[in-house]
């Protein structure tokens, strides 16, 4: 009987500790009190290890070590650029990271002198690095498959200066596909005809 009572008390204490731990993650603010928002950049494949590293890099959590320990072994996270708002709880952060609801990146660029400059900008803005972007932008076989037949020295003209919304996890190949669509949208038949009348080329 005494052993049963001791076991019951032990289980009650353990349950209370787990409940308190869960309540704390469901009610306390995740961000530091001096921040209104912060961005968490979770690299692929989006496992707990990548989330933990993102939290370390962010330096924006009130109790980063506690959060890192809490998500150890958890799964279902998705890579991306996530906006963490003041007032969000650790539990809400976890749910956001599992939802995949990224905050898009606003990309703005002027006409670039060469593709290396543009690739450098892209490497600073997105998950993929500049080398991957440059390779995709100069992949003549892939460009031909998209109907683009330009010489290497003509390729910078393919990337129309403007503002674009893209996800941080955008693949270099999908970025190039988007730019081809924007190029064709810009150089519509009317604009092409006007350029020809003025003696200009695309």
Pin down the residues of each PLM region.
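Conserved catalytic or metal-liganding residues and their short signature motifs at active sites
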Residues: 2-202
């Amino acid at each position: 009987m005494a052993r049963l009572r001791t076991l019951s008390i032990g289980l009650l204490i353990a349950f209370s500790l787990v409940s308190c731990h869960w309540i704390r993650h469901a009610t306390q603010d995740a961000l530091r009190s001096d921040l209104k928002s912060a961005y968490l950049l979770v690299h692929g494949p989006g496992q707990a290890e990548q989330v933990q590293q993102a939290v370390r890099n962010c330096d924006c959590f009130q109790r980063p070590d506690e959060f890192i320990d809490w998500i150890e072994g958890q799964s279902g996270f998705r890579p991306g650029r996530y906006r963490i708002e003041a007032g969000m709880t650790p539990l809400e952060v976890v749910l956001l990271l599992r939802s995949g609801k990224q905050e898009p990146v606003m990309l703005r660029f002027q006409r670039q002198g060469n593709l290396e400059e543009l690739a450098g900008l892209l490497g600073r803005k997105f998950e993929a690095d500049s080398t991957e972007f440059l390779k995709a932008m100069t992949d003549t076989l892939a460009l031909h498959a998209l109907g683009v037949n330009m010489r290497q020295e003509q390729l910078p003209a393919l990337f129309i200066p403007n503002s674009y919304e893209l996800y941080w996890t955008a693949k270099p190949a999908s970025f190039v596909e988007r730019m081809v669509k924007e190029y064709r949208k810009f150089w519509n038949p009317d604009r092409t005809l006007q350029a020809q009348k003025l003696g200009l080329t695309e």
